């Protein structure tokens, strides 16, 4: 929750979505599907895991849609970092793989949903709505009061250093 806004005002604001997928076409398709919605706004895009972490820290979205197979850092690694650095964020993993990866990822990392891309946009929209409506006031309050972790995972630091 924005620090200076009353809880009621925050709850009425459009929820902010960050889309992280290495496919430009997938990102554009999702943006086009959500374009007419007033309850959700796409606040940013990322084409790899490292970019998703940086943008999420800066933009503080309510929900992040992650592709599992991304360059730099895959969706599972990215989700793990995000859960530590962006408190209260909801995460949906959107993948070409079967949903069989879902049970491990949802329990071990805390991902809210794992969807197969072949299931299509209707399933994705349903998962987005579920993730956003199940975000209770308590979670919003925790998000407002918790501070993101100051440290980054060593693997992220190594990848950043190797890019320089």
Show which residues each predicted segment covers.
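Receiver (REC) domain active-site loop signature in two-component systems and cognate sites
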Residues: 70
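The C-terminal output helix
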Residues: 129-144
